[in-house]
Amino acid sequence: MSVVEDVMVLGSDQPLRSIVRDEHLLLSPPHPPKVPVKLWEEHPPLTVVHYPQQYESEAFAPPRGVYENDEIRVEWQKLDGRQPFYHRNCDVDEISYQIGGERTLMSELGVIEFQPGDFSRIPRGVAHDNYGREDSHVLFYIPAPVTELAPAQRESGAVFPPFPGWQPGEANEAITQCMAALGHDITVFGVDEQLLLEQVHQEDRRMAVLRADPGQDVTRLYTTDRIRLGMVTTTPGGQRRYRRTLDADEIQYQAHGHRTLITQRGIVDLEPGDFVRIPLGISHASVATEPGDYVSLLSHRELPQVAETTRTADAYTPERLPSLTVEAR
Protein backbone atom coordinates (compact mmCIF):
# COMPACT_ATOMS: atom_id res chain seq x y z
CA MET A 1 0.00 0.00 0.00
CA SER A 2 1.27 3.48 -0.87
CA VAL A 3 1.24 6.17 1.83
CA VAL A 4 2.48 9.74 2.08
CA GLU A 5 5.16 10.74 4.56
CA ASP A 6 5.52 14.41 5.55
CA VAL A 7 9.09 15.39 6.40
CA MET A 8 8.90 18.05 9.13
CA VAL A 9 11.21 20.43 10.98
CA LEU A 10 10.61 21.97 14.39
CA GLY A 11 10.00 25.57 13.36
CA SER A 12 7.34 25.00 10.70
CA ASP A 13 3.83 23.57 10.48
CA GLN A 14 4.32 22.94 6.74
CA PRO A 15 6.22 19.88 5.49
CA LEU A 16 9.74 20.38 4.24
CA ARG A 17 8.71 17.84 1.61
CA SER A 18 6.18 15.05 1.18
CA ILE A 19 7.24 11.61 -0.08
CA VAL A 20 5.21 8.69 -1.42
CA ARG A 21 6.23 5.48 0.36
CA ASP A 22 5.55 1.76 0.20
CA GLU A 23 4.15 1.27 3.71
CA HIS A 24 5.35 -2.32 4.06
CA LEU A 25 8.93 -1.39 3.17
CA LEU A 26 8.78 1.71 5.38
CA LEU A 27 8.00 -0.37 8.46
CA SER A 28 9.98 -3.55 7.68
CA PRO A 29 13.62 -4.29 8.55
CA PRO A 30 16.12 -3.26 5.84
CA HIS A 31 17.18 -5.62 3.08
CA PRO A 32 20.26 -7.64 4.04
CA PRO A 33 23.51 -5.88 3.11
CA LYS A 34 25.49 -7.23 0.17
CA VAL A 35 28.85 -6.56 1.81
CA PRO A 36 30.37 -8.36 4.86
CA VAL A 37 30.44 -5.19 6.95
CA LYS A 38 28.02 -4.06 9.65
CA LEU A 39 26.54 -0.89 8.21
CA TRP A 40 23.83 0.02 10.71
CA GLU A 41 22.81 -0.44 14.32
CA GLU A 42 20.05 -2.48 15.91
CA HIS A 43 17.60 -0.13 17.63
CA PRO A 44 15.25 -1.02 20.51
CA PRO A 45 11.46 -0.68 20.16
CA LEU A 46 9.55 2.28 21.53
CA THR A 47 8.79 2.17 25.24
CA VAL A 48 5.67 3.34 27.08
CA VAL A 49 5.44 4.75 30.61
CA HIS A 50 1.98 4.59 32.20
CA TYR A 51 0.50 6.29 35.27
CA PRO A 52 -3.20 5.62 35.99
CA GLN A 53 -5.47 8.62 35.53
CA GLN A 54 -7.84 7.36 38.22
CA TYR A 55 -6.62 8.74 41.54
CA GLU A 56 -5.15 6.20 43.96
CA SER A 57 -4.50 7.40 47.51
CA GLU A 58 -0.97 7.29 48.89
CA ALA A 59 1.32 9.37 51.10
CA PHE A 60 2.90 12.50 49.61
CA ALA A 61 5.70 11.71 47.19
CA PRO A 62 7.83 13.99 44.99
CA PRO A 63 6.84 14.25 41.33
CA ARG A 64 7.93 11.29 39.20
CA GLY A 65 10.47 12.17 36.52
CA VAL A 66 9.50 10.70 33.14
CA TYR A 67 11.88 12.33 30.61
CA GLU A 68 14.89 14.54 31.23
CA ASN A 69 17.97 16.10 29.65
CA ASP A 70 20.12 18.95 30.91
CA GLU A 71 17.57 21.57 29.76
CA ILE A 72 14.09 20.02 29.99
CA ARG A 73 12.33 17.84 32.54
CA VAL A 74 8.90 16.18 32.21
CA GLU A 75 7.22 14.98 35.41
CA TRP A 76 3.97 13.35 36.50
CA GLN A 77 2.54 14.26 39.88
CA LYS A 78 -0.49 13.49 41.99
CA LEU A 79 -1.43 15.44 45.09
CA ASP A 80 -4.04 15.27 47.82
CA GLY A 81 -3.30 18.16 50.17
CA ARG A 82 -0.59 20.79 50.31
CA GLN A 83 2.97 20.58 49.07
CA PRO A 84 5.53 20.90 51.90
CA PHE A 85 6.99 24.22 50.67
CA TYR A 86 6.72 27.16 48.29
CA HIS A 87 8.96 26.77 45.25
CA ARG A 88 10.88 29.31 43.13
CA ASN A 89 12.70 28.23 39.93
CA CYS A 90 16.01 29.84 38.99
CA ASP A 91 16.29 28.66 35.40
CA VAL A 92 12.98 27.50 33.94
CA ASP A 93 9.36 28.35 33.31
CA GLU A 94 7.11 25.67 34.83
CA ILE A 95 4.19 24.57 32.64
CA SER A 96 1.46 22.24 33.90
CA TYR A 97 -1.31 20.25 32.24
CA GLN A 98 -4.21 19.26 34.52
CA ILE A 99 -5.18 15.61 34.08
CA GLY A 100 -7.85 15.19 36.74
CA GLY A 101 -9.05 16.13 40.19
CA GLU A 102 -8.98 19.64 41.65
CA ARG A 103 -5.95 21.82 42.30
CA THR A 104 -5.42 25.33 43.64
CA LEU A 105 -2.24 27.08 42.52
CA MET A 106 -1.19 29.83 44.95
CA SER A 107 1.51 32.26 43.86
CA GLU A 108 2.86 35.79 43.97
CA LEU A 109 0.93 36.38 40.73
CA GLY A 110 -2.40 35.20 42.13
CA VAL A 111 -4.50 32.06 42.47
CA ILE A 112 -5.72 29.62 39.80
CA GLU A 113 -8.37 26.93 40.26
CA PHE A 114 -7.61 24.22 37.71
CA GLN A 115 -10.04 22.16 35.68
CA PRO A 116 -9.02 19.06 33.70
CA GLY A 117 -7.57 20.15 30.36
CA ASP A 118 -6.11 23.42 31.68
CA PHE A 119 -2.54 24.48 30.92
CA SER A 120 -0.69 27.19 32.85
CA ARG A 121 2.82 28.64 32.91
CA ILE A 122 4.58 29.83 36.08
CA PRO A 123 7.29 32.28 35.00
CA ARG A 124 10.83 31.79 36.25
CA GLY A 125 11.37 33.38 39.66
CA VAL A 126 7.72 33.31 40.84
CA ALA A 127 7.10 31.56 44.19
CA HIS A 128 4.20 29.10 44.17
CA ASP A 129 2.55 26.22 46.02
CA ASN A 130 -0.28 23.79 45.24
CA TYR A 131 -3.26 22.43 47.14
CA GLY A 132 -4.60 19.30 45.45
CA ARG A 133 -7.77 17.30 45.96
CA GLU A 134 -7.28 13.90 44.29
CA ASP A 135 -5.26 15.84 41.73
CA SER A 136 -2.96 14.59 38.97
CA HIS A 137 -1.03 16.71 36.49
CA VAL A 138 1.94 16.73 34.13
CA LEU A 139 4.78 19.24 34.59
CA PHE A 140 7.13 20.58 31.93
CA TYR A 141 10.23 22.47 33.08
CA ILE A 142 11.49 24.45 30.08
CA PRO A 143 14.30 27.05 29.86
CA ALA A 144 12.88 30.55 30.25
CA PRO A 145 11.49 32.55 28.64
CA VAL A 146 8.65 30.56 27.08
CA THR A 147 6.21 32.31 24.73
CA GLU A 148 2.46 31.62 24.92
CA LEU A 149 0.82 31.11 21.53
CA ALA A 150 -2.88 30.78 22.41
CA PRO A 151 -5.26 33.34 23.94
CA ALA A 152 -5.90 33.13 27.68
CA GLN A 153 -9.18 31.50 28.69
CA ARG A 154 -8.86 33.11 32.11
CA GLU A 155 -6.15 34.48 34.43
CA SER A 156 -4.88 34.10 37.97
CA GLY A 157 -6.63 36.38 40.44
CA ALA A 158 -6.05 38.11 43.76
CA VAL A 159 -8.03 35.65 45.91
CA PHE A 160 -7.77 35.62 49.69
CA PRO A 161 -7.93 33.26 51.40
CA PRO A 162 -6.63 31.14 48.52
CA PHE A 163 -9.00 28.27 49.38
CA PRO A 164 -11.68 27.63 52.03
CA GLY A 165 -10.19 26.70 55.38
CA TRP A 166 -6.77 28.20 54.67
CA GLN A 167 -4.97 29.43 57.77
CA PRO A 168 -1.55 31.08 57.86
CA GLY A 169 1.09 28.87 59.42
CA GLU A 170 4.73 27.93 59.25
CA ALA A 171 5.89 27.73 55.63
CA ASN A 172 9.19 27.25 53.83
CA GLU A 173 10.41 28.49 50.46
CA ALA A 174 12.81 26.44 48.35
CA ILE A 175 14.98 28.00 45.64
CA THR A 176 15.98 25.39 43.05
CA GLN A 177 18.04 25.07 39.91
CA CYS A 178 18.41 22.20 37.40
CA MET A 179 14.68 22.08 36.64
CA ALA A 180 13.67 21.51 40.28
CA ALA A 181 14.95 17.93 40.33
CA LEU A 182 15.24 16.38 43.79
CA GLY A 183 18.54 17.31 45.41
CA HIS A 184 19.05 20.52 43.42
CA ASP A 185 17.83 22.99 46.03
CA ILE A 186 20.07 26.03 46.52
CA THR A 187 18.57 27.29 49.75
CA VAL A 188 15.46 26.67 51.85
CA PHE A 189 14.17 29.14 54.44
CA GLY A 190 11.06 30.16 56.35
CA VAL A 191 8.60 32.68 54.92
CA ASP A 192 5.50 34.57 56.01
CA GLU A 193 2.89 32.86 53.81
CA GLN A 194 0.33 35.65 54.04
CA LEU A 195 2.95 38.26 53.14
CA LEU A 196 4.07 36.14 50.18
CA LEU A 197 0.53 35.75 48.83
CA GLU A 198 -0.24 39.45 49.30
CA GLN A 199 2.60 40.20 46.87
CA VAL A 200 -0.02 39.81 44.13
CA HIS A 201 -1.25 43.33 44.91
CA GLN A 202 2.18 44.71 43.95
CA GLU A 203 2.29 42.85 40.64
CA ASP A 204 0.90 43.88 37.27
CA ARG A 205 1.38 40.47 35.65
CA ARG A 206 -1.02 37.55 35.91
CA MET A 207 -0.68 33.91 34.84
CA ALA A 208 -2.77 32.81 31.87
CA VAL A 209 -4.78 29.59 31.70
CA LEU A 210 -4.71 28.11 28.18
CA ARG A 211 -6.82 25.33 26.69
CA ALA A 212 -6.69 23.46 23.41
CA ASP A 213 -9.21 24.38 20.71
CA PRO A 214 -11.28 21.21 20.15
CA GLY A 215 -12.08 22.43 16.65
CA GLN A 216 -8.43 22.34 15.56
CA ASP A 217 -6.33 19.29 14.74
CA VAL A 218 -3.31 20.89 16.44
CA THR A 219 -3.33 23.70 19.02
CA ARG A 220 0.10 25.28 19.51
CA LEU A 221 0.27 26.56 23.09
CA TYR A 222 3.89 27.30 24.04
CA THR A 223 7.16 27.76 22.17
CA THR A 224 10.84 28.67 22.39
CA ASP A 225 13.49 28.38 19.70
CA ARG A 226 14.10 24.78 20.87
CA ILE A 227 10.68 23.39 21.88
CA ARG A 228 7.02 23.35 20.93
CA LEU A 229 4.25 22.27 23.27
CA GLY A 230 0.65 21.78 22.25
CA MET A 231 -2.36 19.50 22.00
CA VAL A 232 -3.28 17.20 19.11
CA THR A 233 -6.89 16.11 18.53
CA THR A 234 -7.43 12.71 16.90
CA THR A 235 -10.59 11.77 15.06
CA PRO A 236 -11.35 8.57 13.13
CA GLY A 237 -11.40 8.74 9.36
CA GLY A 238 -9.18 9.55 6.42
CA GLN A 239 -6.11 8.03 4.83
CA ARG A 240 -3.06 7.09 6.88
CA ARG A 241 -0.32 9.74 6.62
CA TYR A 242 3.12 9.52 8.21
CA ARG A 243 5.30 12.22 9.78
CA ARG A 244 9.06 12.28 10.23
CA THR A 245 10.49 15.17 12.29
CA LEU A 246 14.13 15.66 11.36
CA ASP A 247 15.31 17.81 14.26
CA ALA A 248 13.21 17.00 17.35
CA ASP A 249 12.26 14.20 19.71
CA GLU A 250 8.51 14.09 20.35
CA ILE A 251 7.04 13.24 23.75
CA GLN A 252 3.34 12.35 23.64
CA TYR A 253 0.99 12.06 26.62
CA GLN A 254 -2.30 10.31 25.84
CA ALA A 255 -4.96 12.40 27.57
CA HIS A 256 -8.20 10.95 26.18
CA GLY A 257 -9.22 8.12 23.89
CA HIS A 258 -7.38 5.09 22.57
CA ARG A 259 -5.19 4.96 19.46
CA THR A 260 -2.55 2.82 17.81
CA LEU A 261 0.85 4.39 17.12
CA ILE A 262 2.59 2.91 14.06
CA THR A 263 6.32 3.65 13.83
CA GLN A 264 9.61 2.43 12.44
CA ARG A 265 10.37 1.36 16.03
CA GLY A 266 7.27 -0.81 16.41
CA ILE A 267 3.50 -0.62 16.85
CA VAL A 268 1.87 0.10 20.21
CA ASP A 269 -1.68 0.64 21.46
CA LEU A 270 -1.95 3.75 23.62
CA GLU A 271 -4.51 4.43 26.35
CA PRO A 272 -5.17 7.43 28.62
CA GLY A 273 -2.26 7.85 31.03
CA ASP A 274 0.44 6.67 28.59
CA PHE A 275 3.65 8.55 27.80
CA VAL A 276 5.71 7.63 24.73
CA ARG A 277 8.83 9.10 23.12
CA ILE A 278 9.32 9.13 19.34
CA PRO A 279 13.01 9.82 18.56
CA LEU A 280 13.88 12.38 15.90
CA GLY A 281 13.99 11.01 12.38
CA ILE A 282 11.49 8.18 13.02
CA SER A 283 8.48 8.00 10.70
CA HIS A 284 5.16 7.47 12.47
CA ALA A 285 1.38 7.66 12.10
CA SER A 286 -1.58 7.25 14.45
CA VAL A 287 -4.74 5.20 13.97
CA ALA A 288 -7.87 5.92 16.04
CA THR A 289 -11.28 4.32 16.24
CA GLU A 290 -12.64 6.89 18.71
CA PRO A 291 -12.12 10.62 19.30
CA GLY A 292 -9.24 11.54 21.58
CA ASP A 293 -6.35 13.89 22.16
CA TYR A 294 -2.76 13.92 23.37
CA VAL A 295 -0.22 16.44 24.61
CA SER A 296 2.76 16.82 22.27
CA LEU A 297 6.18 18.18 23.28
CA LEU A 298 8.77 18.62 20.52
CA SER A 299 12.33 18.99 21.82
CA HIS A 300 15.27 19.97 19.60
CA ARG A 301 17.55 17.98 21.89
CA GLU A 302 17.30 14.28 22.72
CA LEU A 303 14.98 13.82 25.71
CA PRO A 304 15.74 10.42 27.27
CA GLN A 305 13.30 8.43 29.37
CA VAL A 306 14.23 8.27 33.06
CA ALA A 307 11.13 6.45 34.37
CA GLU A 308 10.66 2.69 34.39
CA THR A 309 9.15 1.21 31.25
CA THR A 310 5.60 -0.13 31.54
CA ARG A 311 5.51 -1.91 28.18
CA THR A 312 7.20 -1.89 24.77
CA ALA A 313 6.01 -1.65 21.19
CA ASP A 314 5.43 -4.81 19.15
CA ALA A 315 7.50 -5.47 16.05
CA TYR A 316 5.77 -4.69 12.76
CA THR A 317 4.13 -7.58 10.93
CA PRO A 318 2.29 -7.34 7.59
CA GLU A 319 -0.72 -9.06 9.18
CA ARG A 320 -1.22 -6.17 11.62
CA LEU A 321 -1.81 -3.43 9.07
CA PRO A 322 -5.06 -4.60 7.39
CA SER A 323 -6.93 -4.21 10.67
CA LEU A 324 -5.75 -0.60 11.01
CA THR A 325 -8.02 1.06 8.50
CA VAL A 326 -8.68 4.35 10.25
CA GLU A 327 -6.16 7.18 10.33
CA ALA A 328 -5.62 10.05 12.71
CA ARG A 329 -2.83 12.58 12.75
Regions found by a protein language model. Give the residues of each.
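Polyanion-binding and phosphate-handling cores
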Residues: Y55-E58, P63-W76, R82-F85, D91-V92, ...
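A generic fold-level signal
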Residues: Y67-E71, C90, R133, T224-R226, ...
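Short acidic-glycine-tyrosine-enriched beta hairpin
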Residues: E108-A127, Q264-G281
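Ligand-binding loop in jelly-roll beta-barrel domains
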Residues: R124-E155, E271-P272, L280-T309
